């Protein structure tokens, strides 16, 4: 692992790091905010998974999460959304290929050699973080925006006991029935739709739910509302009697992380 930069931020440290990924078979970059409490011992960790076209930089630079994380003494990791490099397959469309890994393990060419984002987020990066930073890996929460909200929800439900809470802002909630999902799942996983189910939050909710609280924050004037399909997830949560909060707002808030996410994660991590 190599350090790209480390800067003082709200009495803590905002770092950017790169490492060779065995899962994605390329160099991967991530950002990590560590509060000052990490100098004394391990601190809880919150994951922020970003959406389509994003890198590790988007939420790190735009969200203002560091101030709130510093106030509550938690770390925040901002992974990239896909593998990178000249030899990594890509597509002319913004919603496939680089910047659009969809948090799955691709089985189809040309994506399979590098697009193993599920293994990267679920296994490789957590191990790297735990080995190199003062993090309490027994206290983790996860959140995400859009495609990242999809990833946060599916990871949380597929990895019971890993995360104390999951929060999602405008998540792609039912990708197997959406143009933001069917296209990508078919490209990465193939035409057998039975392999798609573990990557659909609505289907996972109906099957197993989540063993902790869920927060969904959705703007009702979102121009992509028909692609996100929050109503399907809301119905599944109601049927499952899931411990969940669905917040609807007339205003679609542009920043990918809100103070509410931090506060919610802190409440669940304490």
Where would I find each of the regions flagged by the language model?
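Non-catalytic cap/lid and distal C-terminal segments of serine-dependent acyl enzymes
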Residues: 1-250, 254, 258, 263
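Hydrophobic alpha-helical segments, chiefly the membrane-spanning helices
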Residues: 264-270
């Amino acid at each position: 692992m190599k350090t790209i930069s480390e800067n003082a931020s709200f009495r803590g440290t905002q770092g950017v790091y790169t490492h060779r990924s065995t899962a994605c078979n390329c160099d991967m970059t991530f950002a990590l905010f560590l509060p000052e409490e990490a100098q004394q011992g391990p601190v809880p960790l919150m994951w922020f998974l970003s959406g389509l076209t994003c890198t590790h930089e988007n939420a790190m630079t735009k969200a203002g999460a560091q101030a709130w994380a510093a106030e509550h003494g938690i770390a925040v990791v901002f992974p990239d959304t896909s593998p990178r490099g000249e030899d990594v397959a890509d597509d002319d469309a913004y919603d496939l290929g680089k910047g659009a890994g969809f948090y799955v393990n691709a089985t189809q060419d040309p994506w399979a050699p590098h697009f193993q984002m599920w293994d990267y987020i679920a296994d490789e990066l957590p191990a790297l973080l735990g080995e190199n930073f003062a993090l309490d890996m027994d206290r983790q929460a996860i959140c995400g925006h859009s495609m990242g909200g999809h990833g946060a929800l599916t990871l949380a439900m597929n990895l019971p006991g890993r995360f104390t809470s999951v929060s999602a802002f405008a998540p792609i909630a039912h990708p197997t029935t959406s143009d933001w999902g069917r296209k990508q799942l078919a490209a990465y996983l193939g035409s057998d739709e039975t392999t798609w189910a573990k990557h659909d939050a609505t289907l996972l909710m109906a099957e197993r739910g989540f063993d902790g609280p869920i927060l969904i924050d959705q703007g009702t004037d979102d121009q992509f509302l028909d692609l996100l399909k929050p109503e399907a997830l809301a119905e599944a949560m109601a049927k499952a009697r899931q411990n969940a909060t669905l917040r609807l707002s007339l205003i679609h808030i542009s920043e990918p992380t809100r103070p509410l996410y931090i506060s919610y994660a802190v409440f669940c991590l304490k």
